[in-house]
Amino acid sequence: MTEGVAAAPRRHLHAVDLMRVLTVALVVGVHTVTHVPVKDTVAAGALTVVFHSSREIFFVVTALVLMHGYGRRAVRWTDFWRRRYLCVAVPYAVWTLVYMLADGHWRDPLGAFLHTLGGDLLTGGAKYQLYFLLVSMQIYLCFPAIRWLIRATRNHHGWLLGVGAVFQLALSAAIHQQWSPGGLVTAWVHGPDAVLPSYLLYVIAGGVAGWHLDRITAWTLAHRRLVLGATAVSVVATVGIFLLQRLALGETTVDASGVFQPVVVVDSLAIAWTFFTAGVSWVERGMPLRRVVLALSDSSFGIYLAHPLVLMGMTTIAGPLGLLSASTRAPIAVVLVIVVGVMAPLVYGIGALPALLLRRTPLSLAMSGRPQRRTSPAAPAPAAREAVAA
């Protein structure tokens, strides 16, 4: 299980630090909108379908970082898996237990508790965001094959992306329409969230981006307006298709704003590229507020793991205060502004505090997937072009 001795790791990708911060913020936003009692309205659905791109962006970023770090050098795979699984499997098990307790399963008889725990560990069902850790573990397991595919098709990555796009669009249509061809395929279509092939294009796209990172960085810096314009068109198209499905085709808001929408495939890649553009532009400008961004990026996994617990606590407090019932009576525009502009940042900020503090304790690995940090993250102010790919 080895391909020689691993070489020195590649330089840190500072642009990805900002991507992580933005993506986690988008995740917190979509979960705040969808888990606070907001009226089932067209406006809420339109916001949700755009924010759902955060899921796919995570897998693009994961594959990009892996391919950049391990794509062109010898890797001892047993060491790779040991390090990666330690940082994912441990917090996965810990947070599964945390959310079981938070949901009241501590009252269950021991046998029922253990049965639920076993099922949640297998499926990621303890809380709605834990599927990402299961899929991440599948990516790590399959990364030797993913790397081989990217390397073997190095001169044909356009075709590889094209085939991946056709597959992803077809799969998204099947999931959205709940096709039932039979057997394991039906089980997959009806339960796609925690299965790696459900995100194949995003892993391929991230891997290709990591392989061609310098070229993509240079192109992005030279075509920033094009990327932003294409993303704006993509967002408008996403909302337009949502409105068509909701108002003309009679789909429910939940169905029309689902994460496995064919149009979300395009929207996710466009927003991912916009986040990358923001990252490389930030590095080019010398990384202003870099200590804040790097600290939030360093704690982003912990924020991701903890934010549903924060959201549960906030809604529990808001109920007796009458805020939740008021949200069902107030104009939806006002509610969405408060949810996105006030509540989501609060969830993010409150989730960040324990994540930042735990990074300096022995609990860091279990709670945030990172070894204990003894000093604050710091970054030099490198030359702009050199630092973009760092």
Region roles according to the model:
Residues 1-169, 173, 321-390:
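Membrane-cytosol interface segments of multi-pass membrane proteins
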Residues 13, 43-55, 122-135, 176-202, ...:
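Interfacial loop-to-helix transition and helix-capping segments at the boundaries
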Residues 38-45, 108-117, 179-188, 216-219, ...:
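Membrane-interface helix termini and inter-helical loops of multi-pass transporters
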Residues 55-68, 137-147, 173-219, 263-284, ...:
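Specific transmembrane alpha-helix
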Residues 95-107, 170-177, 236-245, 310-315:
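C-terminal TM-helix exit segments that contain a strictly Trp-centered aromatic cap at the helix terminus
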Residues 128, 237, 245-362:
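Alpha-helical transmembrane segments of multi-pass integral membrane proteins
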Residues 165, 224-238, 291:
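Signature aromatic-anchored transmembrane alpha helix within multi-pass, membrane-resident enzymes
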